[in-house]
Amino acid sequence: MHTTQKDTTYTKIFVGGLPYHTTDSSLRKYFEVFGDIEEAVVITDRQTGKSRGYGFVTMADRAAAERACKDPNPIIDGRKANVNLAYLGAKPRIMQPGFAFGVQQIHPALIQRPFGIPAHYVYPQAYVQPGVVIPHVQPTAATSTSPYIDYTSAAYAQYSAAAAAAAYDQYPYAASPAATGYVTAAGYGYAVPQPLTAAAPGSAAAAAAAFGQYQPQQLQADRMQ
């Protein structure tokens, strides 16, 4: 004759987090208050015989098992354990509010914009301390101003007639030493061209008045007297 095995899906309880001094009898004693117990065993190491810190309790009926699992973290033998149905597996312990550790997700809208960096250039990460933000530096856009000097009519207009005349007075016309025996014709003149043809019409008249005609000095030949 073959004996049929009883279904323990809703009656077998997993008990984890047990202290090493917990025994089968002490485990049974704790769960007796919830109902009849068919089996209570602490899993031990085969070589050392010491407890591995968990065990199993099989209650007589499903209602007793539900009462035993109502508190998921009971105190057994002076230590907080975790209790759950065996087919569901071990239930994680509930951490106290004062001991909860977590990293708060930083929303991009709550980040201050340091140094004028736009918000879309800052990409916060989830695992960084609040307030510590590594900004993502965007390449600087090219400047719209030209790096070259603007040679326009406005630039030439700043040179007045007096400044232009003073500049030309620094270079007086003189005869070379080799031509001291010759006399050049007096009264000849030449016109100085405009600095640029792109100058404004108003500045062209000022430049013409500034440069004018240059009358060279009469040369005297000392040796021909």
Curated annotation (Swiss-Prot):
It is found in: Nucleus; Cytoplasm. It comes from the Eukaryota. One of its GO terms (molecular function) is pre-mRNA intronic binding. SMART domains: RRM (SM00360). GO terms for biological process: 3'-UTR-mediated mRNA destabilization; cell differentiation; DNA damage response; mRNA destabilization; mRNA processing; mRNA stabilization; negative regulation of cytoplasmic translation; positive regulation of 3'-UTR-mediated mRNA stabilization. Its main location: nucleus. Induction: Up-regulated by the myogenic factor myoD during gastrulation. Residues 11-88 form the RRM domain. Coiled coil: none annotated. The keyword Nucleotidyltransferase does not apply. Keywords: Cytoplasm, Differentiation, mRNA processing, mRNA splicing, Nucleus, RNA-binding, Translation regulation. One of its GO terms (cellular component) is cytosol. PANTHER family: GEO13361P1-RELATED, RNA-BINDING PROTEIN 24. Multifunctional RNA-binding protein involved in the regulation of pre-mRNA splicing, mRNA stability and mRNA translation important for cell fate decision and differentiation. Plays a major role in pre-mRNA alternative splicing regulation. Mediates preferentially muscle-specific exon inclusion in numerous mRNAs important for striated cardiac and skeletal muscle cell differentiation. Binds to intronic splicing enhancer (ISE) composed of stretches of GU-rich motifs localized in flanking intron of exon that will be included by alternative splicing. The RRM domain is necessary for mRNA stability and mRNA translation regulation. This is RNA-binding protein 24-A.
